[in-house]
């Protein structure tokens, strides 16, 4: 499943919409997403699953590039 993650780059930053970044990640669950991103110390605001029509829309209208976490 593909997830869209809204985050701030620094854990100490107060969330400000203009500074929010987005990445797309393939994972089995929201917990799996958070586990994979834990080592980056991001301030994760929201994790959203992207499926069906929403996924097609993101592919056509957004820069949907899956992040590879090693």
Curated annotation (Swiss-Prot):
HAMAP family linked: RNApol_bact_RpoY
Gene Ontology biological-process annotations: DNA-templated transcription
Family of this protein: Belongs to the RNA polymerase subunit epsilon family.
Protein name: DNA-directed RNA polymerase subunit epsilon
Enzyme class: transferase
Functional summary from the UniProt entry: A non-essential component of RNA polymerase (RNAP).
Subunit and partners: RNAP is composed of a core of 2 alpha, a beta and a beta' subunit. The core is associated with a delta subunit, and at least one of epsilon or omega. When a sigma factor is associated with the core the holoenzyme is formed, which can initiate transcription.
InterPro entries: RpoY
Superkingdom of the source species: Bacteria
UniProt keyword annotation of Repeat present: no
NCBIfam families xrefs: PRK13667.1 (NF010188)
A Pfam family assignment: RpoY
GO terms under cellular component: DNA-directed RNA polymerase complex
Catalysed reaction, written as an equation: RNA(n) + a ribonucleoside 5'-triphosphate = RNA(n+1) + diphosphate
EC number: 2.7.7.6
Keywords carried by this UniProt record: DNA-directed RNA polymerase, Nucleotidyltransferase, Transcription, Transferase
GO molecular function: DNA binding; DNA-directed RNA polymerase activity
Top-level taxonomy: Bacteria, Bacillati, Bacillota, Bacilli, Bacillales
């Amino acid at each position: 499943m593909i997830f869209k993650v809204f985050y701030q780059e620094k854990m100490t930053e107060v969330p400000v919409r203009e500074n929010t970044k987005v990445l797309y990640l393939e994972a089995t669950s929201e917990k799996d997403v958070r586990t994979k991103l834990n080592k980056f110390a991001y301030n994760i605001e929201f994790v959203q699953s992207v499926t069906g029509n929403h996924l097609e829309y993101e592919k056509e209208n957004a820069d949907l590039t899956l992040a590879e976490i090693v």
